[in-house]
């Protein structure tokens, strides 16, 4: 897939892959661009390369979820072969965005087990995610479920 990236995409691809392989500190990137410029294609390429890297390391469990591919809508999630933010992070679609409702202990433990090994998060179509959804719902759910056990190294918002 890397061969199909343009020069700027390749530069970004290799930069992120280098960071994934060499740094233990969390890093955050926001990648923007108009419709049809290849952001989702870049996500797919980075996902494949990072997954190959993580699974090649000694002692890695192939069944653990290491990378989240998230999007705000089913159509966007389908486009990157990922899942919706709501379904992955157990955020009810009917819930008021301004009020965060923590999960009960059983559901939270299930989510922690499912996402405990996550190292990399891609959030596609970030422009469709409102400030309240991002800061109240996503941020708090990640703090409750993933960040309390092991902080992912990388977040890419596209």
How should each PLM-predicted stretch be described?
Residues 1-158:
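Conserved ATP-binding/catalytic motifs of P-loop helicase motor domains
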């Amino acid at each position: 897939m890397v061969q199909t990236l343009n020069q700027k995409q390749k530069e970004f691809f290799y930069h992120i892959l280098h960071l994934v392989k060499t740094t233990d500190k969390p890093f955050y990137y926001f990648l923007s661009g108009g419709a049809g410029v290849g952001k989702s294609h870049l996500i797919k390429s980075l996902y494949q390369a990072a997954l190959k890297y993580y699974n090649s390391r000694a002692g890695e469990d192939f069944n653990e979820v290491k990378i989240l591919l998230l999007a705000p809508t089913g159509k966007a999630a389908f486009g990157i072969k990922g899942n919706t933010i709501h379904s992955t992070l157990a955020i009810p679609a009917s819930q008021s965005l301004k009020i965060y409702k923590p999960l009960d202990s059983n559901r939270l433990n299930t989510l922690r087990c499912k996402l405990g090994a996550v190292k990399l998060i891609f959030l596609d179509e970030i422009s469709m995610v409102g400030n309240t959804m991002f800061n109240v719902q996503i941020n708090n759910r990640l703090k409750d479920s993933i960040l309390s056990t092991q902080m992912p190294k990388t977040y890419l918002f596209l």
